[in-house]
Regions:
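Conserved beta3-strand ATP-binding lysine motif
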Residues: 16
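Extracytoplasmic
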Residues: 2-10, 19-78
Length: 78
């Protein structure tokens, strides 16, 4: 039987959104080479490069700060 409960909301840190896969992949590889848990999400025709999926807002905020300290542009997504 399928679980009909809504998916648990997670906080994610977005570092880029591109129409071009190659640009997104380049950023993904750079983040992963620095051991960030990055991935690409295709949404609304954009390849969104995001890091993490946190239950707690505080954890996402800490990751956002870490990424900004490394020079990445970021914002929190849900």
């Amino acid at each position: 039987q399928e679980d009909d409960t809504p998916a648990e909301k997670r906080y994610r840190v977005q570092t880029g959104a591109y129409r071009n896969w190659a640009y997104a992949e380049n950023l993904l590889r750079r983040l992963q080479s620095q051991n960030f848990p990055a991935y690409i999400l295709l949404e609304d025709g954009l390849y969104k490069v995001q890091v993490g999926a946190y239950r707690k807002l505080d954890n996402a905020v800490q990751m956002e700060k870490t990424l900004r300290d490394q020079g990445y542009s970021t914002f929190l997504a849900m």
